[in-house]
């Protein structure tokens, strides 16, 4: 009887550990996807700036909304 209880407790512990690990994996995956989206927007802004001579305001607004910062160009740091 005690071995049955121990087996059930072990299964519960393993299930909790699996949920925690997969939650961490999911959070990190979302971070990676978000960073890829930011990188694509930065590349698009750079590409348009090279083509037209000025930067695209729409892409900068989208990037600043995505990054949730007041700084429009995170790669242009002059306030050190």
Swiss-Prot record:
Enumerate composition-biased segments (Acidic residues). 52-62
Q: How does it sit in the membrane?
A: Single-pass type I membrane protein
Name the UniProt key words of this record, in alphabetical order.
AIDS, Apoptosis, Host membrane, Host-virus interaction, Inhibition of host innate immune response by virus, Inhibition of host tetherin by virus, Ion channel, Ion transport, Membrane, Phosphoprotein, Transmembrane, Transmembrane helix, Transport, Viral immunoevasion
Annotated TM spans: 7-27
Q: Enumerate the Extracellular topological stretches.
A: 1-6
Q: How is it modified after translation?
A: Phosphorylated by host CK2. This phosphorylation is necessary for interaction with human BTRC and degradation of CD4.
A GO molecular-function term, please? CD4 receptor binding
Spell out which residues are annotated as carrying Phosphoserine: 52, 56
Q: Which domain of life is it from?
A: Viruses
Q: Name one GO cellular component term.
A: host cell membrane
Q: What is its main location?
A: host cell
> Region labeled Disordered — which residues?
49-80
Which residue ranges does the entry give as Cytoplasmic-facing topology?
Answer: 28-80
Q: Which InterPro entries match?
A: Vpu (IPR008187), Vpu_cyt_dom_sf (IPR009032)
Location(s), subcellular = Host membrane
Record remark on domains: The N-terminus and transmembrane domains are required for self-oligomerization and proper virion budding, whereas the cytoplasmic domain is required for CD4 degradation. The cytoplasmic domain is composed of 2 amphipathic alpha helix that form a U-shape.
Can you tell me which family this protein belongs to?
Answer: Belongs to the HIV-1 VPU protein family.
Q: Any further remarks?
A: HIV-1 lineages are divided in three main groups, M (for Major), O (for Outlier), and N (for New, or Non-M, Non-O). The vast majority of strains found worldwide belong to the group M. Group O seems to be endemic to and largely confined to Cameroon and neighboring countries in West Central Africa, where these viruses represent a small minority of HIV-1 strains. The group N is represented by a limited number of isolates from Cameroonian persons. The group M is further subdivided in 9 clades or subtypes (A to D, F to H, J and K).
Quaternary structure, per UniProt, is: Homopentamer. Interacts with host CD4 and BRTC; these interactions induce proteasomal degradation of CD4. Interacts with host BST2; this interaction leads to the degradation of host BST2. Interacts with host FBXW11. Interacts with host AP1M1; this interaction plays a role in the mistrafficking and subsequent degradation of host BST2. Interacts with host RANBP2; this interaction allows Vpu to down-regulate host BLM sumoylation.
Protein purpose = Enhances virion budding by targeting host CD4 and Tetherin/BST2 to proteasome degradation. Degradation of CD4 prevents any unwanted premature interactions between viral Env and its host receptor CD4 in the endoplasmic reticulum. Degradation of antiretroviral protein Tetherin/BST2 is important for virion budding, as BST2 tethers new viral particles to the host cell membrane. Mechanistically, Vpu bridges either CD4 or BST2 to BTRC, a substrate recognition subunit of the Skp1/Cullin/F-box protein E3 ubiquitin ligase, induces their ubiquitination and subsequent proteasomal degradation.
| Protein name per UniProt | Protein Vpu
What gene codes for this chain?
Answer: vpu
């Amino acid at each position: 009887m005690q071995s049955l209880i121990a087996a059930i407790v072990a299964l519960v512990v393993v299930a909790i550990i699996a949920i925690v690990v997969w939650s961490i994996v999911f959070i990190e995956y979302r971070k990676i996807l978000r960073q890829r989206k930011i990188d694509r927007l930065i590349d698009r802004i750079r590409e348009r700036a090279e083509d037209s001579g000025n930067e695209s305001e729409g892409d900068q607004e989208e990037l600043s909304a995505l990054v949730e910062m007041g700084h429009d160009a995170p790669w242009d740091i002059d306030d050190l």
